[in-house]
């Protein structure tokens, strides 16, 4: 599956948001790249909407075509479209691995899933976009438990808050999905209504 593999710090600076999490290069220069990066420019309504959509895309590591499909699915849901879109993005397996603290970034989580380190309800899953459901159980596969990424994860457990809609239990770091997240449980600096307005034009 296609994914963006370019310089993510540059995207962070362009969108004025740390897309990685703990990006020291962004923290040093949290303004757009280029000669006029520090200059204040008047941003149009369309530009603000586009930037918010791009923030969401790059935060979750989703290409435009797939993001559009997620939006169209969210439109068909009975709740608020923007909130439903965020719920869909949060339910991706790579995001769940990141939220559970088993990977430092979503990029790393995506790589771990792609390399076949996880099973869901006892079934091997290596698709980062796989969508989890309430009551799903995610396990690190036995052959992967002693690999470096998961040794580090065990040592750093608790460094980042784990959202209440999931739980990590035991030394094998099993992930339990208690529910799919509500908007108040999704901590991302996004104004989802701007994304809805962008696609509604």
Curated annotation (Swiss-Prot):
A Gene Ontology biological process in which this protein takes part is: ribosomal small subunit biogenesis
> Which residue windows are transmembrane per the record?
none
Q: Name one GO cellular component term.
A: small ribosomal subunit
The record's listing under PROSITE patterns reads: RIBOSOMAL_S4, S4
Record InterPro entries: Ribosomal_uS4, Ribosomal_uS4_bac-type, Ribosomal_uS4_CS, Ribosomal_uS4_N, S4_RNA-bd, S4_RNA-bd_sf
Keyword NAD tagged: no
Q: How does it assemble?
A: Part of the 30S ribosomal subunit. Contacts protein S5. The interaction surface between S4 and S5 is involved in control of translational fidelity.
The UniProt entry's sequence similarity note says:
Belongs to the universal ribosomal protein uS4 family.
The name under which this protein is listed is Small ribosomal subunit protein uS4
List the source organism.
Answer: Mycobacterium leprae (strain TN)
């Amino acid at each position: 599956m296609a994914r963006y593999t370019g310089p993510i710090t540059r995207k962070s600076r362009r969108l004025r948001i740390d897309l990685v999490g703990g990006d020291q290069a962004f923290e040093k220069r949290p303004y757009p790249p280029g000669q006029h990066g520090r200059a204040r420019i008047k941003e149009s309504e369309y530009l603000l909407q586009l930037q918010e959509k791009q923030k969401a895309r790059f935060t979750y590591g989703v290409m435009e075509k797939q993001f559009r499909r997620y939006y169209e699915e969210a439109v068909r849901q009975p709740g608020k479209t923007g909130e439903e879109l965020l719920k869909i993005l949060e339910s991706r397996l790579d995001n769940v691995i990141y939220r559970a603290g088993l990977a430092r970034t979503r990029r790393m989580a995506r790589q771990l899933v792609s390399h076949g380190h996880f099973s869901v309800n006892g079934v091997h899953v290596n698709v980062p976009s796989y969508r989890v459901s309430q009551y799903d159980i995610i396990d690190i596969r036995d052959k992967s438990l002693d690999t470096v990424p998961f040794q580090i994860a065990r040592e750093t457990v608790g460094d980042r808050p784990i959202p209440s809609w999931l739980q990590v239990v035991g030394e094998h770091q099993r992930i339990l999905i208690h529910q799919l997240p509500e908007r108040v449980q999704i901590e991302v600096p996004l104004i989802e209504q701007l994304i809805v307005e962008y696609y509604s034009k």
